[in-house]
Amino acid sequence: MFEDIKLIAFDLDGTLLDSVPDLARAVDLAMQDMGYPRVTLEQASHWIGNGADVLVSRALSQNYIVKDDLDAELIKQARARLDQHYHDGGHQLSHLYPDVKDTLERLHQQGYTLALVTNKPSQFVPELLEQHQLTHLFSEVIGGDTFAEKKPNPFALNWLLDKHGLTAPQMLMVGDSKNDIQAAQAAGCHSFALTYGYNHGEPISDSQPDVVSDEFKYLLAVLSMAR
């Protein structure tokens, strides 16, 4: 299935990096600033994945389903507070999942082109990659505000295909949420899903990715078997 893969696109939060503790802290402090109910780690783990504006909207709504009458200015204020607290926290609570760095380095050495496609605001991504010594591994880094559309829209994946002159079967999307899998399916490329991330409380297998794994390093085995 994966014998033609040339380019591998990775999600960040919940795939490479466990960032929920820092995000939960930041959104909780933002809600406290604004006099709204506090946000728990468990709530935050179900609410992230669709970008920062959606995260604060869910926190303001205290629900995964955002209130229809939520004021745009209120969302803007909450987003500004979230960004400030997230920046001030220095990402000290976040950590790479097991075998991520070694696996990425081996894929890079094997000649695969690696790209990062995340819904996280772009301003925070370079610092995180540098902090975990991953910057040199990615040919492209696409944040949630790089283009007008973010995952599950396939725009970023289609852009990568066009830039590298590849067809859809030559690209693999690696992620932990239905946003990643739906983007891959819409672009026509292959998908590799991880069970340990953040998928809004739903089994990632429900999204019907090509491969489901509990371990990031299994990606090496799958690609090796395809060669």
Swiss-Prot record:
The pathway it acts in is: Organic acid metabolism; glycolate biosynthesis; glycolate from 2-phosphoglycolate: step 1/1
Query: Cystine bridges: which residues?
Result: none
Catalytic EC class = hydrolase
Q: Which reaction does it catalyse?
A: 2-phosphoglycolate + H2O = glycolate + phosphate
One biological process term from GO is: carbohydrate metabolic process
Cite a single Pfam family from the UniProt record: HAD_2
Q: Which GO terms describe its cellular component?
A: cytosol
Please list the coiled coil stretches: none
- Keyword Membrane present in the record's keywords: the answer is no
Q: Record's NCBIfam families?
A: HAD-SF-IA-v1 (TIGR01549), HAD-SF-IA-v3 (TIGR01509), HAD-SF-IIIA (TIGR01662), PGP_bact (TIGR01449), PRK13222.1-2 (NF009695)
Q: What is this protein called?
A: Phosphoglycolate phosphatase
Q: Which organism is it from?
A: Aliivibrio fischeri (strain ATCC 700601 / ES114) (Vibrio fischeri)
